[in-house]
Amino acid sequence: MYFFIFLKKGQHYLKSWPLESKLGMIFPENRVIKATLFAQKFMPFLAVFAITWQQVYAKSDISALAIAVFSAIVALLIPLQGLYWLGKRSITPLSPQSAVWFYEICERLKQVNETLPILTEQPNYQNLADVLKKAQRKLDKAFWQEL
């Protein structure tokens, strides 16, 4: 049950994290998101290709079929691993240094009259992603150069 919740949270986190090059130097999310998006597009093709290739070149070999099916299953699980990691990451509380940075961005957004949700607990990475997405839309490019 929790596995599917983490996958859903991971998909939401994937969509809400801004893919800015400056953030890629600080957080691993950019690399994980790009790898997950790549895996979502191409791993189903690889899974079908593995089984088709086996059927064309080794029809009567049962062990080759088992290896091809196993390869297909592994290929299909790779995007799920990325989504699971993103889901776990989204609920992880921010480190103290990142929390300070989070509150600084919130203050800048308040200066441009952007409404922010009220946090009753320590901010997590999903909150950071939401704030960064708003900053991407509302703040100028100079903000990203200051990072």
Swiss-Prot record:
It is found in: Cell inner membrane. One of its GO terms (cellular component) is plasma membrane. Keywords: Cell inner membrane, Cell membrane, Membrane, Transmembrane, Transmembrane helix. InterPro entries: UPF0208 (IPR007334). It is a multi-pass membrane protein. Belongs to the UPF0208 family. This is UPF0208 membrane protein PM0703. It comes from Pasteurella multocida (strain Pm70).
